[in-house]
């Protein structure tokens, strides 16, 4: 009864009248409403203890302290004689958190944001925080143009003061831009200006960048694009006065109006450089030269500032400040650019450290460095080290960090942070390819043997037409100067007829050794010696083969053996940004070989492969790839180049959409030769005196292949796997011909195989995936230019480890 009177009194009078201005001595403290929170924990959070004399201010502080714990959503403090009665209502505990209706935002991202706000399973539920989260999520949807979106938190009570929390999303549809207006433009049309925007009110089918869905961030980017467009064309006084974004009543349409002031065009009258140039005034002035009467260009000014910083960075000035201040003369419409440079301190490298290389030895990474310890810091040298590490192929990512040495004004440590990839593989499996049929592979390949950088491989494969095995070893640093040494031994049993070639069997084995000589950062020369033994059998006489056998002095042979020694040479230019799935740069690879004295054959052979990647966006997700492959070979000393050394085209690695090796010259079998076999191994003979035409490819001594690809982001693939999957649209073309072909030696219905103009073409789509099994390549191509005897194969794929 006394407590009820006290509560009524507290509503009618101030706290001072309740507790008394002089206060009272607390004899005991009682709690009501505690469930999850222990009494001891609650007492520790209070500033009042038994025996204290308390007044109104102490009671207010007690209430605030209990609220501050975050455990209570209601607190009342009452007096019952000399007992302090604390009535609390605990906040419920979150038992579970679920989401419904969220399509644009993933559950994991929502959980991270909730946890950052203190909302997680097992914690108390703060309804105020929940309201802020609802509003924040709705603001996010508004920023991406979904103005009809709503987010509601549904709290379901459970026993023992627990609750289930469910966030219910109604995302709605994105508001589409109905019209973009630019007001105040006179020099350029609205259509011209909007054509450079990401946001559009109209998007043609071919525009893969434009978007009618409104997003606040994209609008901000487009306004910067508009500003740069004018500043780059001399409009130094250009200004965006205001921007209005209007929403239609149904919240499904957006109207954007941008008000601008163009101003006049201004020309640069000169550039004045001042400040601490660190003795490099001449080089800096070369970077600031302008042509007389050149229009003011904001992008060029920014590039000039960056170039000055890079120049100073190469000389150890790691943190230079470069500021350009345009002085505008409205009278003669000119701009004088005043550039202030402060080179700052020159920094020296105390240490170069590596992090993340758990397998690779420090020495393997350190030998790729161009920046030296103890020397001044060169930003270009640090970047070269990063490029070289990337090209090793040992790492998924390589990052650099320049860290100042504590207590030093002129020293830094350079840290290379790497994430190693699995450079070794033990493979035993089965694959299938449209070109090779069922294939069995087994092998051990380690590109970074025991962390030493050595490449060691024991590999083998067996399919419908080939049995192949190889042992190879390469030491990329045979000498401290970077001269590499590589060698291999191999065995190959090749059934040509099963590979859609003219019929013969070749059992070969051999070895070679090669030295690589680095010329500079991007160029390497190679030279080596090789030996190969070829044992040919089951040769069915055909014109190209007969020509070779005649040049060897054994025209009627059905079996033949040759031992050849070769001088092998090559040159590689490699400026790709990374080893696998590159997106920028070029690679040129020239290889060749020529027989040397002691060989049964006398011939030479040269191949040239090129690849150029050109990114068309800043993120390197859209890339144009151009590839070419050229090959030529011929005999020496009156002998022919062996037919089994011919070039071939067709298949997934050359001209897609055609069966492997089927492009180019076909076998013309001589009278009496076995020309074809059925399923019972019964054969038919050629009975024509002039020879029999066939569809069996024989290749040629000359080849030309070109490909143009447009690499695009792969749909439905998350960013996590973007670097292991690649999609592209392609156009392939190529041909193979025989420069020694004599049309008079064949029947009249046989094409002229010496004509290089018989070009095949195809177009299609390809998907590449670096799967756990190894490379997996799908392609679908439609040949749209082909010739008699060509074999089309629209869908092609290869699964399994390739060597």
UniProtKB/Swiss-Prot annotation:
Domain of life where this protein originates: Bacteria
Gene Ontology terms: biological process: Gram-negative-bacterium-type cell outer membrane assembly; protein insertion into membrane
Position of the signal peptide: 1-20
Pfam families named in the record: Omp85, POTRA
Localization (cell): Cell outer membrane
InterPro entries on file: Bac_surfAg_D15, BamA/TamA_POTRA, D15-like, OM_assembly_BamA, POTRA
Domain POTRA stretches: 24-91, 92-172, 175-263, 266-344, 347-421
One GO CC term on file: Bam protein complex
Disulfide links within the chain: none
Function: Part of the outer membrane protein assembly complex, which is involved in assembly and insertion of beta-barrel proteins into the outer membrane. Constitutes, with BamD, the core component of the assembly machinery.
Subunit organization: Part of the Bam complex, which is composed of the outer membrane protein BamA, and four lipoproteins BamB, BamC, BamD and BamE.
Family under the similarity heading: Belongs to the BamA family.
Protein's name according to its UniProt entry: Outer membrane protein assembly factor BamA
Species this chain originates from: Salmonella heidelberg (strain SL476)
